[in-house]
Amino acid sequence: MQGSLMLDIGGTWLTAEDRQILRHPEVGGLIIFARNIEHPAQVRELCAAIRAIRPDLLLAVDQEGGRVQRLRQGFVRLPAMRAIADNPNAEELAEHCGWLMATEVQAVGLDLSFAPVLDLDHQRSAVVGSRAFEGDPERAALLAGAFIRGMHAAGMAATGKHFPGHGWAEADSHVAIPEDARSLEEIRRSDLVPFARLAGQLDALMPAHVIYPQVDPQPAGFSRRWLQEILRGELKFDGVIFSDDLSMAGAHVVGDAASRIEAALAAGCDMGLVCNDRASAELALAALQRLKVTPPSRLQRMRGKGYANTDYRQQPRWLEALSALRAAQLID
């Protein structure tokens, strides 16, 4: 049975302390960062070592493209999503990019990348910027839908982020508590559109650590109004809800790590991420042990179903995707 906590490790191999914490059944996933990565073979070995201890863990990474891609040496340098949108055949290129990303990520033993970004580029948020496909909500939904088709064709579940949209809030939730003061109706007409259009295609969503004070005084990731009433109720979304990193400044409004993971799960998150802070991860773990949470079975849907080896580079679709992205001058 998978647990409700996703955490991280400090280096390129498992320490004795890492092995010990991963054995706790409350731990359900592990996310890797650039510090954990040297080259594809090393990542493959790391994933195998993790699965030897806990074969049921979800193994994740942020491999969006552009400036947010942790897997670099030995991997294709993916373009920023905004660069794709600038091409006349953007929909086709987005699908190629989604397939290529998902194939490479799964080939080293990881299950999923937290992608695609569904935020809109309103030219306000530096933390979103070129990570977004577009400022136009319908076109963003179209291109993100193509990216998701590529991911699904490669066997990877898709996670849209950051619900209900981070693009209007100017502050960076990694270091501050952003606010979006617009009304719910304004948000419905713009930032919520990609999430609404793609609710039936997405396997998971990640809410924003942003406060929308006209809707709820809590950040979206701690808000039953956003997660239960709007996402589950109105949009009929039945996939997994991952919290964004509960160590980020935007989550600190709720209290310590134990309070944060408890609040996230109570609001409707299925799994809470606690990264870059082992002491906080241990606090969250202790809270889950006390709460005796039973994670939903839908977490199993997030397991990768694609290549677990390197022969994908001989596949016609790989060569086709590379050729198309090179022709558009999106990759080297």
From Swiss-Prot:
GO cellular component: cytosol
PROSITE patterns linked: GLYCOSYL_HYDROL_F3
Site (Important for catalytic activity): residue numbering on this chain: D172
Domain of life (superkingdom): Bacteria
Signal peptide coordinates: none
Main location as per UniProt: cytoplasm
Subcellular location: Cytoplasm
Catalytic activity field: Hydrolysis of terminal non-reducing N-acetyl-D-hexosamine residues in N-acetyl-beta-D-hexosaminides
EC number: 3.2.1.52
Active site residues of this protein: H174 (proton donor/acceptor), D244 (nucleophile)
Pathway assigned in UniProt: Cell wall biogenesis; peptidoglycan recycling
GO molecular function, one term: beta-N-acetylglucosaminidase activity
KO phenotype (gene knockout): Deletion of this gene increases fosfomycin sensitivity.
Binding site for substrate: D62, R70, R131, K161, H162
GO biological process, one term: cell division
Keyword list, A-Z: Antibiotic resistance, Cell cycle, Cell division, Cell shape, Cell wall biogenesis/degradation, Cytoplasm, Glycosidase, Hydrolase, Peptidoglycan synthesis
Family the entry assigns: Belongs to the glycosyl hydrolase 3 family. NagZ subfamily.
Job description of the protein: Plays a role in peptidoglycan recycling by cleaving the terminal beta-1,4-linked N-acetylglucosamine (GlcNAc) from peptide-linked peptidoglycan fragments, giving rise to free GlcNAc, anhydro-N-acetylmuramic acid and anhydro-N-acetylmuramic acid-linked peptides. Contributes to intrinsic fosfomycin resistance in P.aeruginosa.
Assembly and oligomerization: Monomer.
Name assigned to this protein: Beta-hexosaminidase
